[in-house]
Amino acid sequence: MSIVTLDGEIIHYEVLGRGRPLFFLHGWVGSWRYWIPTMQAASITYRAYAIDLWGFGDTAKRAERYTLDQQVKLLDSFMEALGIAKIAIVGHGLGAVVGLNFVVKNPQLVDRALLTGFPLGNSAVNARLRSAPLPELVDWLLGKAPGTDAARAEANKTDPQAVRASLNDMEALNLLDLTMRMTTPLKASCQ
């Protein structure tokens, strides 16, 4: 388990490979473990980092850290703590929303982004994310596919308040507008 301490709080991450830094950001019910197969493939060419966002996996769980702004600050502080100057980002769901916000606020720190499965508006957010209990969300999002046991165990570490806080913050955002304001090369798959 790799950690860095930011403002006295533990941030958990895992890293594989050598090369240019590539950050993987997980979805609403997940952690770094979600990305293992992709990290293994990417680590041939890149230094692949998978970070547990505030409230997920083994990263600290404090409700005041769960806003999208705090998640963006986590990435910036993480890069500074590790001495990383520029990254590429791959994000899914919540990770895509955090990644998009990070790129718009810090275009000089990101050379490209691949963002998938993020809603362009609140009407595109599945109501289950707001209302379903965590075990139901884990089953829905991870399915029953073989090989999901480790990811399922990690997903159960999610603080449901972290999911709700990010969804509440999204109500004030126009993600389509943010996407249009990006100057960093972007490949996106939206809902």
Residue ranges and their predicted role:
Residues M1-I10:
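N-terminal cap/lid segment of alpha/beta-hydrolase-fold proteins
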Residues S123-C190:
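Conserved alpha/beta-hydrolase catalytic His-Asp/Glu region
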Residues K61-V72:
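Catalytic nucleophile-loop/oxyanion-hole region of alpha/beta-hydrolase
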Residues H26-W28, I87, G91-A96:
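Conserved alpha/beta-hydrolase "nucleophile elbow" surrounding the catalytic nucleophile
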Residues D52, A88, D111-L114:
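Residue in the alpha/beta-hydrolase core beta-strand immediately N-terminal to the catalytic nucleophile
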